[in-house]
């Protein structure tokens, strides 16, 4: 029973950190990253389709993304989708490739992005702590029902606390790395 609770805690905490990584990868830094365009949907034969399914996105250099559209007739639709996204990008097409130059980030925009990243990290920390709280409540219920001893309860709570601390440290490390990346010019 205790092992199931610990395994569940680790799985849920891992999902929280993975979610944070996913959110952080979508936050634009000064560097061109293909993941930046992951959230863009393109109108494809009457339905909204993720950009990744109609085109290949690669970093051409540190400031330019190259989008290779699979179907030539989709070039205008892809270009329009990138332009109308809230990323503030101005793509230009050249044959079957669309080049997306990334403008340099202003100091004000960098600070806004850092605030956003810190809020995301805090949300991940809260999520990890909520998992700990749920697990401790499960342990208390087992203790109350006399399914585990007080020593087992205390030991399990300490192990869950260590797990929580390691995941919170991981969140803090991710935050520090992203802040450093955002402040690079």
UniProtKB/Swiss-Prot annotation:
Major localization class: cytoplasm
Pfam families, sorted: RRF (PF01765)
Keywords: Cytoplasm, Protein biosynthesis
GO biological process, one term: cytoplasmic translational termination
Cellular localization per UniProt: Cytoplasm
NCBIfam families assigned: frr
Function: Responsible for the release of ribosomes from messenger RNA at the termination of protein biosynthesis. May increase the efficiency of translation by recycling ribosomes from one round of translation to another.
GO-annotated cellular components: cytosol
InterPro entries associated with the record: Ribosome_recyc_fac, Ribosome_recyc_fac_dom, RRF_sf
Protein name: Ribosome-recycling factor
Family as reported in the entry's similarity comment: Belongs to the RRF family.
MF (Gene Ontology): ribosomal large subunit binding
Lineage: Bacteria, Pseudomonadati, Pseudomonadota, Gammaproteobacteria, Aeromonadales
